[in-house]
Swiss-Prot record:
Recorded catalytic activity of this chain's protein: [protein]-peptidylproline (omega=180) = [protein]-peptidylproline (omega=0)
Organism per entry: Stenotrophomonas maltophilia (strain K279a)
Pfam families in alphabetical order: Trigger_C, Trigger_N
Ranges for domain PPIase FKBP-type: 158-243
One GO-annotated biological process of the protein: protein transport
Protein name stated in the entry: Trigger factor
InterPro entries named among the record's database cross-references: PPIase_dom_sf, Trig_fac, Trigger_fac_C, Trigger_fac_C_sf, Trigger_fac_ribosome-bd_bac, Trigger_fac_ribosome-bd_sf, Trigger_fact/SurA_dom_sf
SS bond partners: none
Length: 431
């Protein structure tokens, strides 16, 4: 098969090719024959259904399947014939040279020139899990299970305070009648600092009027940019009651026997997983920034960037909806605001792929299995999760891509000029 190629842009190519009609017809005839031998149709004995009936019932479907399959096969052959390294999905249209002629418009990988990763400068962060980190996590778990006990003393940091508030902005009272009711844990920045500090020391039934400065962009226009008198009245003060780290508490986290050392060991393993992911994210970001700085002048495939920008917009919209917020009507050009970030993401992705290709880097089975088992270990039935990955090609493909990217990022970092910077666990996981 011969396919002609035309350059229609710096990174765009147009392939013109025709499907071999004899192969298409041969495939259709063969497939209809298979169906005739195996299908059961009422009124006919198996294998004795007339060809005309088979054609009427299955002809259009078989022809469509054959055409799609041969189109993919012929397109792939044309790409190999012209040694094209394409990115994204092709746009395939009907050609002008007959029923079986097609034109495929594709984008290709840009020329990055000599990719010398040894010229990059990368900071590689390290961190370790300490006993103090485990203690902190246990304290966090205790706080997650805390209950609240009413007290008669004045409120202090860490207390849960039920409050009633109302504001006076000039002649206007908010709300016009009654009060706004709510609860806050003091010291967590849930209200204006002036209000939280004003509540410290107040007991149930006590109130105080405070001068509070509202920011210019405050959501209530009548308060925005003004200093307003806010009255707070304490309805209830409760102190936290955290459970003891006893056998029952430990068992509630799935540790059989309630053994404290096993509990700490499990927590360490969880923190190690979290730390490993956080350090890889930092390294991915570090390497990505260096690649962007070194190759930002290289033109990116426009359609690939456009698709990435739309995907980023869709991801943000979905996140907003998951948070229970309304999105409203999305402007047709809303994705334009994501194009700069999309171009950087595309640049890094293509460079990582080129580094892997040029240096013949292959996916390491050991690393893939380790990552799969690491993911599975966070579930109650890890072997079922592993089996799910092995039986789902799409799921496995996503994992393979992720592991391969991490493998290449590591490879680049090892060969770049790099320094190490040690962080605490808390600093390391702070993205």
């Amino acid at each position: 098969m011969q396919a002609s190629i035309e350059s229609t842009g710096n990174l765009e190519r147009r392939l013109s090719f025709s499907l071999p009609e004899d192969r298409l017809q041969s495939h259709i005839v063969g497939r209809l024959g298979e169906i005739a031998r195996t299908t059961r149709i009422k009124g006919f004995r198996p294998g004795k259904v007339p060809a005309k009936v088979i054609e009427q019932r299955f002809g259009a479907q078989v022809r469509g399947e054959a055409l799609d399959g041969l189109l993919r096969e012929t397109f792939d052959a044309a790409v190999r014939e012209h040694d094209l390294r394409i990115v994204g999905s092709p746009r395939i249209d009907k050609g002008d040279e007959g029923e079986f002629s097609f034109v495929a418009t594709v984008e290709v990988v840009p020329d990055f020139g000599d990719i010398d990763v040894s010229k990059l400068t990368v900071v590689r962060h390290t961190a370790e899990i300490t006993d103090a980190d485990i203690d902190q996590m246990i304290e966090n778990l205790q706080n997650q299970r805390r209950t609240w006990a009413p007290v008669s003393r004045g409120a202090q940091d860490g207390d849960l305070v039920a409050v009633e508030t109302w504001s006076q902005a000039g002649e206007e009272r908010l709300p016009a009648e009654g009060t706004e009711k709510g609860s806050i844990v003091l010291g967590q920045g849930m209200m204006f600092e002036t209000i939280e500090k004003g509540l410290v020391g107040l007991a149930k039934g006590e109130e105080k009027t405070l001068d509070v400065e509202f920011p210019a962009d405050w959501r209530v226009p009548v308060l925005a940019g003004k200093t307003v008198q806010v009255t707070v009245k304490v309805a209830e003060v409760s102190e936290p009651v955290v459970p003891a780290v006893d056998e029952a508490f430990i068992k509630s986290f799935g540790v059989k026997g309630g053994d404290v050392e096993q509990f700490r060991s499990d927590i360490r393993a969880n923190l190690e997983r979290e730390l490993k992911g956080a350090l890889m994210n930092r390294l991915r970001r570090e390497v990505g920034e260096q690649l962007i700085a070194a190759y930002s002048s290289v033109e990116m495939p426009p359609r690939l960037v456009e698709n990435e920008a739309r995907a980023m917009l869709a991801q943000q919209v979905e996140q907003i909806r998951r948070n229970g917020q309304s999105v409203g009507e999305i402007p047709a050009d809303a994705h334009e605001g994501f194009k700069e970030a999309a171009a950087k993401r595309v640049l890094v992705g293509l460079l990582v792929g080129e580094v892997a290709r040029i240096n013949d880097l292959r996916l390491e089975a050991k690393r893939l299995n380790e990552t799969m088992r690491l993911i599975a270990s966070t579930y109650e039935e890890p072997e079922q999760v592993i089996e799910m990955y092995r039986n789902d090609p799409q799921l496995m493909s996503g994992l393979q891509n992720r592991v391969m990217e991490e493998q290449v990022i590591d490879w680049i970092a090892e060969r770049a000029q790099h320094t190490e910077e040690k962080l605490s666990f808390q600093d390391a996981i702070r993205q």
